Amino acid sequence: MNYWTKKFTHLNRKYWNGKLSTIKVVVRDLAKDGAEGLYHYPYEDEEAMIEIDKNLTHHEKTNILLHEMCHHAVEELYEDRPYHDHGSEWKKEMRKCGFIGRINSKRGRYKTKAG
């Protein structure tokens, strides 16, 4: 298990009491994707996975991981599991993790409004 997958496990215990299934976390260059982080939904034979941009600081990677974990939480914890993108369920999970201020799809690197 790599460092960031272990970090996922730690944050899962801290914010979700370990309720989320552990998924693989990969750190790579996401410049071509134009993203800081990606959550891949489970589909057919593909398992869920999180990718984080390698060019971020450790602090930013941690917050991006939380952002993507909130997508995973909506997928696993909400009964209807609608395609949620950055909807109300996801925003609720972001606030649960300590993100404050305006919560939208661009929020991830920083938890506070100042960031």
What are these regions (language model features)?
Residues M1-E60, E76-G115:
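Metalloprotease/metallohydrolase-associated module, dominated by Zn2+-dependent proteases
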Residues N63-E76:
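Active-site recognition of the HExxH zinc-binding catalytic motif
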